[in-house]
């Protein structure tokens, strides 16, 4: 339940008391005579239902504390939306009942009645009655439409016990409002107080009699004239604020049920408005519109009465919960639904109109018939293979011409053949040109039957199926390469040759593989020239190929040469002799692979020789082919072949 606007809330918190008009005094005879022409409007309703829960603690009233300040010493003001300048009448009294605190008031402001008459002439909801058993009364209908509830302005409930006997009034005024903070505070307007009390079933007969007897004694003519000086702009602003109260009509129905108000009344809690009749508004104002405006707004006299007679019974027979069957749909959503329904209906109508196929003729047209068989004898090229009639009187075979049926009769007609498929007007056998690969030996991965559809701008791409085939081929090649890496082929070991000066040496010298320190030579060590050689074609060395132990010819021992002096050049066919130039140290190779004998000889002492100046050596290390480079090459070739 949403809280009402601040304009319609009751001022229950303790604050500085508002100036209260002076008690009623003697009324001049002229003023009383002017008000005698218009009957006063009475109203009654609960300003608080004790048993109904409230939204705030300040809204609760203790019946014992309230009863101590009743009855009122005199009438209190009755205004609109708690506005002091909108004083429209007087509150005759507050009566404490078993169900709640009941209020009885009267409206006597002549300026306010004039404003109600002008508003009712322009309001469609005010002129729509929920029950036609009641006589039309524009003033009562407008009051129920605009100000359907009551709001009591009093001091805070906590200050009620100690406020008795003070100078501050306990109840300041009662306001007519669009929505009160307390539930069940709906007002019933009428011209008779007894008729108003009869609409509240929550009041017992004894309570109705006590209220009518106690508050009917002061005559409305004896009360002073209210000073209604509020501008229309302020009242309009309050009405606009009330229009933004959430679920206002639903709350108004709840208040009507809480107060137990029975029909018929002028209450507009369940009434839907009709379009306003501008002619009645103009007649009430006493003005005339231009002729063009009158033509645009005046309905046709033949249809005006009929339309109003059809609309009023509909509004009268509408149930109280009729608005619950309606839902609010945005305009865009409604237009979308409407367009969808129209499209569906259009397709359905077209299907019913052209959906049933038309019966084709018994004989197909000549254009779709099978051509006659060719003659058994050859025909000159370029002519139709029609049968040859050597007899002059022989009649050729003529086929009657049958026109083509309409398009709807043959939905599955074969499409026309292209020109290059025809030979002499007769379909020729299919021909597909031989595909010429971009390079010799290219593997064919595309099928001739595959056909790519039309491509639009931005869709120039290869078919997904062909790309998947290329990826599968690449995966198979990668798998083959991985398998080949698991079982690599033996590579020849590098044979080392020293980069020596061209000096004659007496004895030949072999230079096998250097130790591990060769790749990171220390200061003073001799570098080497590394080159991969074929051990069977190299000169000046012993063939040294890896192989299983004990198989083949005996291998020569692996030697390590330490250069401390003159270096000897290798000789073709030389053996492992000439220890005078360098000390040769024989050792057993690690890992089970050896070149030479399996026995290890003890080291021999090295004779000291005169050191030669260190020579600069160059290393040329040829790398193995990279597998990554090979994969990149294959991938690039595949991309080039696909483009």
From Swiss-Prot:
Biased composition (Pro residues): 16-27, 489-515
Residue numbers spanned by region Interaction with pAP: 324-343
Residues with site note (Cleavage): 269-270, 621-622
This protein's name: Capsid scaffolding protein
Extent of motif Nuclear localization signal: 439-445
Spans through the membrane: none
Active site: 82, 151, 173
Entry keywords, A to Z: Host cytoplasm, Host nucleus, Hydrolase, Phosphoprotein, Protease, Serine protease, Viral capsid assembly, Viral release from host cell
InterPro entries, A to Z: Herpes_virus_sf, Peptidase_S21
Ranges of Low complexity composition bias in the record: 1-15, 290-306, 607-616
A GO term, aspect molecular function: identical protein binding
Any one GO BP annotation for this protein: viral release from host cell
Record region (Interaction with major capsid protein): 623-643
Any single GO CC term annotated in Swiss-Prot or TrEMBL for this entry: host cell nucleus
């Amino acid at each position: 339940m949403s809280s009402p606007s601040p304009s319609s809330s009751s001022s229950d918190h303790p604050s500085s008391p508002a100036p209260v008009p002076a008690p009623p005094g003697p009324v001049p005879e002229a003023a009383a005579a002017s008000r005698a022409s218009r009957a006063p409007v009475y109203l009654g309703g609960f300003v608080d239902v004790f048993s109904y829960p409230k939204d705030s603690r300040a809204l609760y009233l203790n019946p014992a504390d309230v009863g101590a300040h009743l009855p009122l010493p005199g009438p209190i003001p009755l205004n609109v939306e708690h506005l002091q300048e909108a004083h429209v009448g007087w509150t005759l009294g507050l009566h404490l009942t078993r169900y709640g605190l009941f209020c009885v008031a009267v409206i006597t402001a002549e300026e306010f009645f004039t404003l109600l008459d002008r508003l009712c002439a322009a309001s469609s909801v005010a002129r729509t009655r929920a029950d036609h058993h009641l006589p039309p009364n524009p003033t009562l209908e407008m009051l129920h439409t605009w100000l359907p509830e009551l709001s009591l302005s009093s001091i805070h409930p906590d200050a009620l016990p100690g406020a008795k006997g003070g100078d501050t009034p306990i109840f300041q005024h009662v306001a007519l409002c669009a929505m009160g903070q307390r539930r069940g505070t709906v007002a019933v307007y009428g011209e008779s107080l007894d008729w108003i009390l009869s609409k509240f079933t929550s009041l017992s007969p004894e309570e109705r009699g006590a209220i009518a007897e106690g508050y009917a004694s002061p005559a409305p003519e004896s009360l002073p004239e209210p000073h209604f000086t509020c501008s229309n702009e302020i009242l309009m602003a309050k009405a606009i604020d009330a229009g933004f109260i959430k679920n206002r009509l639903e709350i108004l129905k709840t208040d009507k049920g809480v107060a137990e108000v029975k029909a018929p009344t002028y209450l507009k809690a369940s009434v839907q408005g009709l379009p306003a009749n501008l002619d009645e508004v103009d007649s009430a104002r006493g003005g005339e519109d231009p002729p063009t405006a009158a033509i645009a707004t005046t309905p046709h006299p033949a249809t005006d009465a009929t339309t109003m007679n059809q609309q009023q019974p509909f509004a009268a027979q509408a149930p109280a919960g009729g608005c619950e069957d309606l839902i609010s749909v945005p305009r865009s959503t409604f237009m979308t639904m409407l367009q969808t329904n129209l499209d569906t209906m259009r397709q359905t109508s077209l299907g019913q109109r052209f959906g049933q196929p038309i019966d084709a003729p018994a004989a197909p047209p000549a254009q779709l018939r099978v051509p006659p068989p060719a003659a058994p004898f050859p025909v000159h090229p370029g002519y139709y293979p029609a049968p040859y009639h050597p007899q002059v009187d022989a009649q050729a075979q003529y086929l009657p011409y049958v026109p083509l049926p309409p398009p709807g009769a043959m939905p599955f007609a074969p499409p026309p053949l292209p020109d290059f498929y025809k030979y002499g007007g007769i379909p020729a056998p299919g021909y597909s040109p031989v595909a010429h690969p971009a390079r010799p030996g290219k593997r064919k991965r595309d099928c001739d039957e595959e056909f790519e559809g039309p491509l639009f701008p931005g869709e120039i791409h290869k078919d997904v199926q062909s790309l998947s085939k290329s990826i599968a081929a690449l995966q198979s090649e990668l798998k083959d390469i991985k398998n080949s890496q698991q079982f690599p082929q033996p590579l020849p070991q590098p044979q080392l040759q020293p980069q020596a000066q061209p000096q004659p040496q007496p004895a030949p010298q072999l230079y096998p593989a250097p130790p591990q320190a060769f790749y990171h030579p220390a200061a003073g060590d001799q570098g080497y020239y590394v080159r991969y050689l074929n051990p069977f074609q190299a000169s000046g060395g012993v063939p040294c190929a890896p192989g299983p132990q004990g198989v083949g010819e005996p291998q020569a021992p692996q030697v390590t040469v330490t250069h401390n002096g003159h270096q000897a050049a290798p000789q073709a066919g030389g053996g492992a002799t000439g220890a005078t130039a360098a000390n040769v140290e024989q050792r057993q190779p690690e890992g089970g692979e050896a070149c030479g004998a399996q026995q290890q000889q003890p080291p021999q002492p090295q004779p000291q020789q005169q050191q030669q100046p260190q020579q600069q050596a160059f290393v040329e290390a040829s790398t193995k082919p990279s597998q990554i480079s090979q994969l990149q090459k294959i991938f690039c070739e595949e991309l080039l072949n696909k483009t």
